Amino acid sequence: VTNIERETKMSGSSHSKGVLTLAGFLGGQFAQEKPLAVSAQLTFEQNYGGVDGDSASSAELYALLSSLADVPLKQNLAVTGSINQKGEIQPIGGATEKIESFFDLCEAKGLNGGQGVIIPNQNVDDLMLKEEIIAAVEAAKFHIYSVKTVAEGIELLTGMNCGKREPDGKYTQGSVFHKVQQKLEKYNQSIEAAQIASSQHMDDNASEYEED
């Protein structure tokens, strides 16, 4: 996984560590039998001021999983939270401020009952929210979801089952992780076919050289 912010020296060490961690998670979930046959690039479009902190690492992972699975993510939910290589969501700073900022944006556009924020479970007890937000949550006009794992987050964002690894190494049929696994297997097959074709081409050239 290429962190474009890091390559352009616009990423702090904490953000770079978060990207490396999500790459480790992907490897642990989908590269137990074969290496990951995929190259991905992450960037914050039209960002010119630099990026630091790992609180976006869970959102970055969800975006990668969405792309690999060809499954769209809900755009009415904001996400914050860092991850570890086990797929556990870890606490972040400024949770209250992040919720309030997204709430203000949603309120300005009009609350429709579908908007909300996904935060780490460990941050729940530290929230100091405005009465206005509490009232909106109680009225089901705005939602705050706490998650402990990547699996919980991806299910909220897609409305689909994340999937569990079966004894045969495959993920649950039709799940998000199963779709990711299928895409990666397709990439592997394409690479293997290209390697075979390249090897055959080299053998043919060698045979022609010997005949000459």
What are these language model-derived features?
Residues 1-10, 14-212:
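Peripheral, non-AAA+ core regions of ATP-driven protein-machinery
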